[in-house]
């Protein structure tokens, strides 16, 4: 945690690498001072079928889920960083949006397996 989920129009895969989009989003989150880089998890999901108004055909929407407790100004700063960096690096994307969400710490549950380290002998 935090989780950064990038939704995008699959047509963008012909314009640039989605891995680059993930790196730009990660870097913006890392320098935001809202979270630690080691905690950031980024994933991307393409959409084949998209209906947008006004002739818009490409989009990137980023949802960042954080445990509750950040100030509104921190969340606004994070959203602006992500949006600005994506717009600067991927100017062909017609619609870029960011949503920062609070996760309920009582309801959020996680299971994490620790890697097994082999005996050095």
Where are these regions (language model features)?
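Mid-chain, well-packed structural core segment of small domains
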Residues: 52-90
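Short, internal active-site loops enriched in acidic
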Residues: 11, 46-50, 102-106
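Short amphipathic alpha-helices in soluble, non-transmembrane regions
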Residues: 19-25, 77-82
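Short beta-strand elements
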Residues: 36-44, 94-99
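C-terminal structural segments of small proteins and small subunits
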Residues: 84-109
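Short edge beta-strands and adjacent turn/loop segments
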Residues: 5-7, 16, 38-63
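Short, low-complexity, polybasic intrinsically disordered segments
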Residues: 109-121
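Short, well-structured hydrophobic secondary-structure segments
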Residues: 24, 28-41
């Amino acid at each position: 945690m935090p989780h950064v989920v990038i939704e995008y129009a699959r047509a963008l895969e012909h314009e640039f690498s989605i891995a680059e989009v993930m790196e730009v989003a990660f870097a913006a989150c890392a320098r935001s001072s809202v979270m630690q880089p080691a905690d950031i998890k980024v994933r991307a999901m393409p959409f084949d079928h998209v209906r947008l108004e006004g002739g818009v055909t490409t989009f990137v929407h980023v949802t960042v889920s954080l445990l509750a407790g950040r100030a509104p100004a921190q969340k606004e700063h994070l959203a602006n960083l992500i949006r600005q960096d994506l717009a600067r690096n991927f100017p062909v994307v017609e619609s870029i949006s960011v949503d920062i969400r609070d996760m309920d710490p009582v309801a959020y549950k996680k299971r994490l397996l620790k890697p097994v380290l082999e005996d050095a002998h």
